Design a protein with these regions (language model features):
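Nucleotide-sugar donor-binding/catalytic module of glycosyltransferases
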Residues: 1-168
């Protein structure tokens, strides 16, 4: 499996469908969705169970006592079966070609060079399609997150994936 799309959630049954609908619309289908519920009491479990019966793609759901997002992410990384780990927050929506774009960017990196990369990051847009934060200085740009911020002054929301083996 190529991607694990991971969603930590807490009392977000009212927004979680945005992620689900975005995943249903993806043109790239080699992914699983791992959800870690951080102690919700709002019907999240029933909502996810309904989606699991639809069997559109693999969905794993784990509920834990409320411990915070960082603990949920650690559990999600442990449960991940994909090679690449992408966090989609419980209110996120993304275009139908998002996973395909990430896949294409990753496979454009020669296999022999991939061990030197932690993942791929892209720009985020608001619902009107306006870029949130600063653009990168080039379409393809190799950098560390620290260099992006401190050396290049790139700020604002970004979204991307990391190699699962490094997240663990």
């Amino acid at each position: 499996m190529k991607f694990t799309v991971f969603t930590p959630t807490y009392e977000r049954a009212h927004t979680l469908a945005r992620v689900y609908n975005s995943l249903c619309a993806q043109t790239f289908s080699d992914f699983e969705w791992v959800i870690v519920d951080d102690g919700s009491t709002d019907g999240t479990a029933d909502l996810v169970a309904g989606w699991q019966t639809e069997n559109r793609f693999p969905i794993s759901y784990e509920k834990q006592p409320n411990q915070g997002k960082h603990i949920a992410v650690n559990l999600g990384a442990t449960l991940a079966q994909g090679d690449l780990f992408l966090i989609a927050d419980s209110d996120d929506a993304f275009p139908p070609n998002a996973l395909q774009i990430f896949h294409d960017a990753w496979t454009a990196i020669p296999v022999s060079d991939r061990e030197n990369f932690t993942g791929v990051t892209g720009l985020c847009v608001d619902p009107d399609g306006k870029i949130i934060g600063d653009k990168f200085p080039a379409d393809i740009f190799d950098s560390t997150p620290a260099d992006c911020y401190y050396r290049h002054g790139i700020k604002g929301e970004k979204w991307g994936f990391h190699r699962t083996d490094l997240i663990r």
